[in-house]
Design a protein with these regions (language model features):
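Oxidoreductase cofactor-interface core, primarily capturing Rossmann-like NAD(P)-dependent enzymes
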Residues: 1-46, 60-63, 67-72, 81-84, ...
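Residues lining the SAM
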Residues: 8, 78, 283
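Low-complexity, intrinsically disordered/propeptide-like segments
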Residues: 30, 50, 303-304
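Short, conserved active-site loop motifs that form the nucleotide-linked donor/cofactor pocket
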Residues: 51-53, 138
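Residue-level signal for pocket-adjacent positions within structured domains
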Residues: 54, 159, 191, 273-276
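Cofactor-binding loops of NAD(P)H-dependent oxidoreductases
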Residues: 57
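A hydrophobic C-terminal alpha-helical subdomain
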Residues: 234-305
Length: 305
């Protein structure tokens, strides 16, 4: 009997919902999935209906993680943007090594270095080192900002005000973006590839696009006037806190927004250039930002509660 793949954050969260996409893509291929979820709800039941084994667990409880990993062949590790990454990494690395896991695909942010611009990115660097020391066949996906992040931000003001309000500088600011589904395709490619070099890192950028182009795309696809309003970091943090973002996520995203608006992003710079990873490993061309907006029109125009 084929051992299942353990997929963490399988229900999906605020970001690109990559765990949910990975689970669905694996199940479509007939690969058994053990979906690691924080709680049982309608999202986990949807995965159960698709054929996934549901495991309700806690990233920070080593016994819970050991039970989740036992009997699995490989792991997709995507820790939410919240406190606890290093504890979760240590628990997963230990459990995976004990269980004889031979492959772990680790999702991190675009830059993963000791001097990366956000606290979460610097933690991601440490997390990578721990997984590699564990000798469990770890590889790392370094994904850029998700379309879904931008979509969530737009929904807060676009329906009522016809505006996208963010601290991203002028409309000439260029952003490296990617669809969560494309990141999931890369993850599935790495989880199922017969040839894999442990310790390898795969940058994933689907497109580079200016704020001006983003606003123009919203207006064209949604059929309404859309404008960009630059707000201060403090105003963004206040809005984010009111929407329930945790302090870790606010600190990470605030630093990320500063870094992006302060960088004169050159698409030829390898740190920000569109990568061929999605097509070569994920098996499909990157989703365009316009396609993302078309697919999410109803959500983008729905007023937030």
């Amino acid at each position: 009997m084929t051992r299942p793949v353990l997929v963490t954050s399988a229900s999906g969260g605020r970001q690109g919902k990559t765990g949910r996409h990975v689970s669905e893509l694996l199940l479509k291929r007939g690969i058994p999935v053990r979906a690691f979820v924080h709680k049982i709800d309608e999202r986990s039941e949807r995965l159960r209906a698709l054929g996934a084994e549901i495991f309700e667990g806690d990233f920070l409880d080593i016994r819970s993680v050991q039970r989740a990993v036992q009997g699995t062949s490989s792991i997709y590790f995507a820790y939410p943007v919240q406190d606890g990454l290093m504890d979760a990494t240590a628990a997963m690395a230990l459990a995976a090594r004990e269980a004889g896991v031979s492959r772990l695909v680790n999702l991190v942010m675009l830059q993963s270095t000791p001097d990366a611009p956000t606290p979460r990115m610097r933690q991601n660097y440490l997390s990578e080192q721990v997984f590699e020391w564990a000798n469990i066949g770890a590889v790392h996906i370094r994904a850029t900002v998700f379309y879904e992040n931008l979509g969530a931000a737009a929904r807060q003001s676009l329906p009522a005000q016809g505006a996208v309000r963010l601290p991203w500088g002028s409309e000439s600011t260029v952003l490296p973006l990617v669809a969560g589904e494309d990141v999931a395709r890369v993850a599935v490619g790495l989880l199922t590839s017969p040839q894999l070099v442990a310790g390898a890192a795969y940058p994933v950028i689907g497109t580079t696009i200016s704020l001006r182009e983003i606003i123009t795309t919203f207006a064209r696809v949604l059929g309404k006037n859309v404008r960009y309003e630059e707000i201060s970091d403090d105003e963004w943090r206040s809005h984010a806190a009111a929407r329930g973002y945790n302090e870790h996520a606010i600190a990470h995203l605030s630093a990320l927004w500063r870094a992006l608006r302060g960088a004169a992003i050159d698409p030829n710079d390898p740190r920000y250039a569109v990568t061929d990873t999605i097509e070569k490993i994920g098996g499909a061309k990157p989703k365009t930002f316009e396609a993302f907006v078309r697919e999410g029109q109803s959500e983008l125009l729905a007023k937030s509660a």
